[in-house]
Amino acid sequence: MAREISSISRIGTSEPFELQVARGQISYHESVYKFGNNAQVADSVETIWQQGGLYSYLSAESVLKVSSSSANDTSAGTGARTVELFGLDGDYNEISETVTLNGQTAVNTTLSYLRINRMIVRSAGSGGANAGIIYAGTGTVTTGVPANIYATINGDGSNQTLMALWTVPAGYTGYLMQYDVSNGTTSNTPAVCKLLLVARPQGEVFQSKDVKSLTTGMHIENTLVVPLKFAEKTDIEARAVSSSNSVTFDISAAFEIIYIKNGDEL
């Protein structure tokens, strides 16, 4: 039988449990805040990430190619110079590495990834941000764009990926504490934007865990009294769809997860 990991908050300390987790004061507890944006959601279901469309996951551990649509994103350029990737290896263990960019020419990662959860610009030239769109992907790279795209950093000054998806690492259980969603549109045509919170346990298919319907300009903040529990290696993502083929929504979503080491992994 698996041992339960005890949280310090059970003895009534005055500092909030969530703050203690963020400060690294509770052993075997980690936190993650994932957020994304999709500015072109129409009447087909899309993942909330800047590339648009439904996200396609890597089916096997792979070396990724990191490149940019701009020649200025290079080691001595005015744009982004280095990026850090965060993901999971073929055994679903957390990994990360820093890559020095070479403009539109792809640079291979040293590590192999089964999941890419985040990518951040760590250093840049005088522009202070990436000049083009930075990609992490596989396949043939044409003018900086790989055939298969798994992460992007758009040239909007964010300096990191905006992708509302995450995978629970091996040996951990994830607890979704809260999620938020907001939207907007320039259309005057009445329409509803539907948010879908979905998850895929390993070896299964994506299943809806919550659904919210929003009209234009709405913001929903949903704090869960009882968190949603996700087993190791579960893919979690936020998706959206418009009720009208003539109304496109700009939608953002975020979720907070605390993930705890499984007792039998100690």
Predicted features along the sequence, with ranges:
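Beta-strand-centric surfaces of beta-sandwich/beta-rich domains
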Residues: A2-R115, R122-L266
